[in-house]
């Protein structure tokens, strides 16, 4: 493998054995591709905005005299970029402008004669844009639209599995689900009649639908039944015989023909009898006349002479009726063929219960069911029925729905109309009847072939269409009002309903979620999440076990591990690593094609439906050099089952061992040794890890860390290769390689880094460069690390030296004992940034004012404010400190005569205002790192706002000037090269000022042209610079668009540094979580023979019952990795020769059986080997991919190489006594995470505070500064102890005895420690409630 200069800095040793056939795809493509499809112009008009416009336009007036046509649309440029939107709290969006054409036709002239055409571009609201990382910025916060897994449109056949009816009879049903429109259900009842429901309303006999479609009884029977023809010969009756129809019946008479008895009376007819009849070619037999009684006529029989109806279709034959038919000259009688086995008489029975007998009565019946209480007219009934399933405006199966519909009915074509046809309805009924008859299977609803993914683009398109349809109605009415000659398209369209629909979707839809931004992994996982909830999906309460369960079709598509614990389990899933959606929205996963027993590198993506037909081998099947299967029998999957197949039968093979799991689960090393429940917790807890101060790459990883860090977008990644020309904490400049430059550009890429920004979860986002000046970089290299990344690898926690042993009960019940060294070295110190906002509004009594002049506040409290009343940057503040001084005018109060006198003497008018300053919340302390002031247009800016503005302008100018200088330098370097090659002497050139170089003339025409081109570029650069500077200045100085009634907003950013402390929650990656019980002095921790103390002591009893053995293997492998690091460190300290170092490191990389990774250090320069060694001295990072990881033997070899006992256990000594522990202890390195459940956020204590209004009891909860509830069970405890006074105190003065608690406060102030309980307020509430029932209760005073 070829490594770039940056990748050579630290190479992770990979224990994977299987070759990597397919690279990990871009992990955010599901979001980005979907949205791209939505906004890009689609000439076919199948997707996105184009499809929405085409489905609604043209809008014709009711009279047909005019129409509004759609021509095209374009998206403008967003006003603010993403960062500005986040700071200002606005939506990152672009204006949508649509070109519309108003066509007016001549009234009296022939159809289609155009009178006037007007074309105009119309503004149709703002469309939120997706950022490069797959998120949306809505009102300044980053949000993610989660993809939805919903039931695909189409037809589904299902049964109630015998749960509906008490008899346990299985009732079958069919449901036609459109993409939009009414649902159509067919279902059997326990009496085997077929019923229909529209939109889940009351059921009607299914034949009503057929009658409404215009079918008569005769035609209905003709559609669903085979016929038996009887001929009357004198007094004999002959029947046409189809032998196959007799199977399973019992002969009720001798079946004979040509004098030979084939089946005797009372015998069961078997397949042998049928073969005999077929062989002899028997087509007719004579039957006794009684046999026909009870059979059903298939058509109407009329007496030709009188025209009288003798026998109607679907009428049961009796001997009398037979005689009548015979007399009226009907010699051939057709009856329906039915039997109890596989040709039920369901439709015939249904016709009997059908109240309607012609089309009109059927339509009326449907109208009554859909619109109860409205009087039906013929037109209304016809229109309603027509609109239900046969109107393109109201009903759409969609391409997916039609494809699934046709596939289900085994039709050949997969395309067709979006509305239903007669044939569609009849074929669904036929198939349902076949299933009831025992032919065919019901569908599996949880099969991923029946559930599809709806991503951002599609959902946004649907919302947009909803908005357009609202506008359509208004436009139709506008077109019909006349005076069109003066109107333009602009006057027709009101953009409000459209932008409201879009805004509602992005702002408050159940699937538009506040992005989980704890760390890069949680961002990526959130964007790859798939939810079965949401509009048009399931609800938590109704979802049963089947929907939540893992289904065989999830393999390689949806992760079986990563799902939340709790009520949403199984409803919210994560996309597997390699999964993607196909054009219809079904999930597909890649497989390698197997041809002639050889596994090729040809990759096919198969959906769940296609996969069912193939035999697929697992990724860890043994292959030889050529890719042939070594074993005769191979474990494969086929039709959802796993079993052994011969190697000749295999058609596909998995692409990778990681294919099954999601990104989160693929980051757990030795996942294959963990119990699934613990793996689930492990995958979920990685998402809650807080980024530490210094990220530390995991010693034991899985090789997925780099992909996650790069794709998450938190790192700065090189767009093009080149050389690092400049680097500081906030900017990296790359001079691009000549071969990657675009013609006519300066060839400089500038990367501005994000510094100390707040994330959605209040963690800190900051980027740090990881390249140095002059280094070569290639496209895709990581230039700067973001939060939780280390040299371009995901680093969620820290590598800690752990020992599994009990320690004085401090690790009881999963508690964790931590060494003080961890705190001293700031290993788990995290930075949290809070945003506090102060809003100044215009009130009825006058505007609120932000000022440092606050009534009744001492000097000390104002010491951290400037003259505008806003806190300084860098001030250290604690709970209760004022951050922004604000006063609110309060109404004139009635003054007492004394106050009036005082006012008159001291002339004090200041108390007309009350203090409403922004203060630091209780229990929070930190440093102010930034202040932003937003002022409404037209409101005078205060001094601080102007200072901030000036600072921003300076910064912007500095940035742009530096950018210009960098670009100029690049350009002049090229001009210099052209002039020198054109014959100008270099030293003379250097004496001239650079600007004069452009005036020089060259004799060589080519060179002169190049020089002129470069001169043009230089002018363009300067012009561009002026333009950018002006735009920036305008943006910074313009007023802000604030909500109505808001004059000013001051946002203060507070950074809090949190060290690890008892009560914080920590976890490993295997679901092994615990709470810190004690931070122990270093000298008391157990230490080894070299005197190295351990960092963390874990409870060994947490392992066996939980069956997450992965943590033990990780510990051993971590120890080995550290051992090798220490050996390298020792060699570096002794200044060993590079050859020795190279040889040792090479040996380490080569260790293992048949590993796929080949690192050849002989191609590395000495300097590169030294730098690699520097980066490996703290431990050699190791990758052990999921299901393809390091074997026990390899771990032992690595331990041996690191000079550690192969048991992985060492002797420890007690730090307090220095005595040896009795047995050896497992010690190693485990990757530990600090989770975002910090004790600082949970700790809470109340002295006095607010009370509830009605009950007068203290409020509850930390947010309200509430008290602890002393509940029913706690009262029982005090009663059981007989602690009467304590109980009285709890129920009165400490709770809701208002007078008692005020008296008690007075007593305490007076130093008199006594209490007199009074009447609890809740008792008064009870009295009032009883009185409200009309029962008077009076308390007797003693």
From Swiss-Prot:
Keyword Transferase: yes
Molecular functions (GO terms): DNA binding; DNA-directed RNA polymerase activity; ribonucleoside binding
Database matches in CDD domains: RNA_pol_B_RPB2
Enzyme Commission identifier(s): 2.7.7.6
Protein family per UniProt: Belongs to the RNA polymerase beta chain family.
Main function: DNA-dependent RNA polymerase catalyzes the transcription of DNA into RNA using the four ribonucleoside triphosphates as substrates.
Annotated protein name in UniProt: DNA-directed RNA polymerase subunit beta
Species of the source: Pectobacterium carotovorum subsp. carotovorum (strain PC1)
